[in-house]
Amino acid sequence: MGKGVGRDKYEPAAVSEHGDKKSKKAKKERDMDELKKEVSMDDHKLSLDELHRKYGTDLSRGLTPARAAEILARDGPNALTPPPTTPEWVKFCRQLFGGFSMLLWIGAILCFLAYGIRSATEEEPPNDDLYLGVVLSAVVIITGCFSYYQEAKSSKIMESFKNMVPQQALVIRNGEKMSINAEDVVVGDLVEVKGGDRIPADLRIISANGCKVDNSSLTGESEPQTRSPDFTNENPLETRNIAFFSTNCVEGTARGIVVYTGDRTVMGRIATLASGLEGGQTPIAEEIEHFIHLITGVAVFLGVSFFILSLILEYTWLEAVIFLIGIIVANVPEGLLATVTVCLTLTAKRMARKNCLVKNLEAVETLGSTSTICSDKTGTLTQNRMTVAHMWFDNQIHEADTTENQSGVSFDKTSATWFALSRIAGLCNRAVFQANQENLPILKRAVAGDASESALLKCIEVCCGSVMEMREKYTKIVEIPFNSTNKYQLSIHKNPNASEPKHLLVMKGAPERILDRCSSILLHGKEQPLDEELKDAFQNAYLELGGLGERVLGFCHLLLPDEQFPEGFQFDTDEVNFPVDNLCFVGLISMIDPPRAAVPDAVGKCRSAGIKVIMVTGDHPITAKAIAKGVGIISEGNETVEDIAARLNIPVNQVNPRDAKACVVHGSDLKDMTSEELDDILRYHTEIVFARTSPQQKLIIVEGCQRQGAIVAVTGDGVNDSPALKKADIGVAMGIVGSDVSKQAADMILLDDNFASIVTGVEEGRLIFDNLKKSIAYTLTSNIPEITPFLIFIIANIPLPLGTVTILCIDLGTDMVPAISLAYEQAESDIMKRQPRNPKTDKLVNERLISMAYGQIGMIQALGGFFTYFVILAENGFLPFHLLGIRETWDDRWINDVEDSYGQQWTYEQRKIVEFTCHTAFFVSIVVVQWADLVICKTRRNSVFQQGMKNKILIFGLFEETALAAFLSYCPGMGAALRMYPLKPTWWFCAFPYSLLIFVYDEVRKLIIRRRPGGWVEKETYY
């Protein structure tokens, strides 16, 4: 992809006058597909001559300033284009008008409409509808502000990319070195980088001196990678002669030619990929939408039916419209929006205490419905520190302790060979502990040096005491540092042991190279000739440790004879004047980044919870497979195709892939797969490891899982993970080692970088889903005793049993705390033993929940309310049958002589006081029956006696709603303010039998469900 091609690919599409949206969308999809493809470039394959011709750059003098200015004008600055951001006011409006809020807004508008109609037609219209409209609007605005505030901290993806862009770059133009702003670097520029610099653009290295770069933010490989002019791999991400934009140079120096700048760099493409991805709706948002459809359906159905009915009953058009509006509004659960928001916030707070920081409230529940987790290996499943795992000396393998707290196995440290091996590992080692860490445990100390050497340093320090003291005793005279051509490191030390010669040569390096330099081997402290049998033993040990996915190093030494090398001898490392062959082989030490202690248990929990854990790593397949087996992602006894082939001794291509439950897929194979082949792998293998994968592939794997209908969680820490984090249903970033970019793209951040915290998150997510169901069931039930009075008022023409203001007191007063208290309810059974919920069938609110809340419990509650209503009116002289058809005269303010059943006459004022007392009593009855409803909503299957009453907030809720009801009824002045009147104590007890009935009815129902699982009762009533 030359300069021209690279540029054209990102030209904005010409859009016709009509603003052709379709072509824009198609272009976006095309661009995304482009980005998903692997990085394609051929600059790493070109010779220096071809590079010179392609870019017109003088390889020693660089570009001329004039040419550089031309290219800058053509390509634009070397910077990442920020994505279009959503303005804050749009985000705020989404909170105000999204989903549930819309339902309440419609309710509010209908209230104002009803008030308007009444004002136009009546002389002194009641203000109920006006109050209701104002309250509904206030509820939406307050909850909207609350949600907006919760989420305002999110989505600044590009901000963090900006911080990663280097500020200055050292370029050579016209043979002169100049430091320029990194944004002015152009394709073809000759750039110099040194240790500590950020790479300013994608470079093709033309000369290097000991240059190493840290690519971890891009590829996920934790080891620094060597950079040299040599073309070593077809894949541009793997070859040594390309350095990538915004990675760090950790040591050495290098010169290179800029091949891509800005958005066209590999990092730029990832940035574009991450910001261009659509996150999609969260499962809970879909659930709430589904719920709104249900509720609206019920409300409109009831409203229209009674509208028609009231016309049949010869009401006027205007009255019928007001009834219609009243019924629809009465159906809206005003308090539910606040309840859901508060429940999610509480869970988010609870998760933060357990090291999961949730950025987006709805993500709390998404984690609970997760059915596949794609996890990174390094640092998430593992401890992210190389640790000595095994040693081979005295012709046997010894296991070292890799646990985080040194509680594991130990080996025999008495052998003389171990003394020699630990001496080499400590001396032939440039790693040192950083200062002032004496009080810290050895394994927690920071080390200056590369990963393998730090592992050796810590191991020897733990097993043999201070390495510094050892190094002081054995003074270093000269050393040859490790380099990639001879693949060993060597040093010569003064030997303080009187029984041995005065100089000790120690060497470590690649095992096969070390063995080639040895003629003898140390066994039990005695030197013996190295024969074929021992060479075979070495080979077997080397293969076994390598097969465990460990990095193996060989160690040897030589005591230099005093005759040839007396004290004060001048050793020369350039013209080597000492032996580097015929040494004595001592042993092997292998290292691995070991699994975290809590991970195997967490993976086991995921498995019993029906969640598939897939490992996706940039690491080597053998290492990946070893760790996967170590943590249980590949469980014991499950074989891969390669294992089966090895067992049956046949070629791999003769094994039927479906016989293997587990599989390890190499990134290079994944590259050539069609999406159907990937789907087959994901469908037919239960245990999967993807190794050597690139960022684009991680995205393809996530999409593959989503095609299977899975809800996918992805963990990641590098920049390379951000596209996958954004695409997944829930992206989980690492809080400690994660790059800013990955944290921005994620929905949740693990503060302790531990995979086990995800499992805690899943548990919390499942619990909140269950508890939201209970909250909603509780809240919806009181809708029926709120609507039925209105319906009976229309049909039977009786005085209104329950007013609008009292309905508001229930929905936004007495019901709020109890509904929220259900969020604190403990899990009924082990929620981690069941399969993830199926988003298509297992809904938050289903028909069964509506039938239970409205059709069964709600009806009993309504009966309780009407019973109280009729009792009070009868005590005042109006018997039930006398009330039928009395509405017209009852509500007429000019009639002051309405007779009751006993012939007494009632004025308008007196009648209204009795009516409002009934409203208050009906309200209190609803509170009383809601006690029972709250208690039965604690569980969906268990008996309340099994669950117990441990939820303190719920008990507080019961007292709170009762106290509030009493306050509203007995507080002086309530008659004028809310038209609530004091009740006789006996009237409180009218609804008690109904409350008891609800409790008994539901306990019996749950008993039948437990006794006959899958039976008719469960099918019809278990929500």
UniProtKB/Swiss-Prot annotation:
Effect the entry attributes to changing P83R: Dopamine fails to increase phosphoinositide-3 kinase activity and to promote its interaction with Na(+)/K(+) ATPase
Main location (coarse class): membrane
Broad EC category: translocase
Enzyme Commission (EC) number: 7.2.2.13
Effect annotated for changing G303R: Results in altered sodium and potassium transport
Region (Disordered): 1-38, 216-235
Sequence intervals crossing the membrane: 88-108, 132-152, 289-308, 321-338, 773-792, 803-823, 844-866, 919-938, 952-970, 986-1006
Active site per the UniProt annotation: D376
Pfam families in alphabetical order: Cation_ATPase, Cation_ATPase_C, Cation_ATPase_N, E1-E2_ATPase
Subcellular location: Cell membrane; Basolateral cell membrane; Cell membrane, Sarcolemma; Cell projection, Axon
GO biological process: cardiac muscle contraction; cellular response to mechanical stimulus; cellular response to steroid hormone stimulus; energy coupled proton transmembrane transport, against electrochemical gradient; establishment or maintenance of transmembrane electrochemical gradient; heart contraction; intracellular potassium ion homeostasis; intracellular sodium ion homeostasis
Entry GO CC: apical plasma membrane; axon; basolateral plasma membrane; caveola; endoplasmic reticulum; endosome; Golgi apparatus; intercalated disc
GO terms for MF: ADP binding; ankyrin binding; ATP binding; ATP hydrolysis activity; ATPase binding; P-type potassium transmembrane transporter activity; P-type sodium:potassium-exchanging transporter activity; phosphatase activity
Modified residues (Phosphotyrosine): Y10, Y260, Y542
UniProt entry keywords in alphabetical sequence: Acetylation, ATP-binding, Cell membrane, Cell projection, Ion transport, Magnesium, Membrane, Metal-binding, Nucleotide-binding, Phosphoprotein, Potassium, Potassium transport, Sodium, Sodium transport, Sodium/potassium transport, Translocase, Transmembrane, Transmembrane helix, Transport
Region (Phosphoinositide-3 kinase binding): 82-84
Pro-peptide region(s): 1-5
SMART domains, A to Z: Cation_ATPase_N (SM00831)
Side of membrane Cytoplasmic, spans: 6-87, 153-288, 339-772, 824-843, 939-951, 1007-1023
Similarity comment: family membership: Belongs to the cation transport ATPase (P-type) (TC 3.A.3) family. Type IIC subfamily.
PANTHER family the UniProt entry points to: SODIUM/POTASSIUM-TRANSPORTING ATPASE SUBUNIT ALPHA, SODIUM_POTASSIUM-TRANSPORTING ATPASE SUBUNIT ALPHA-1
Protein name (database record): Sodium/potassium-transporting ATPase subunit alpha-1
Organism field: Rattus norvegicus (Rat)
Lineage of the organism: Eukaryota, Metazoa, Chordata, Craniata, Vertebrata
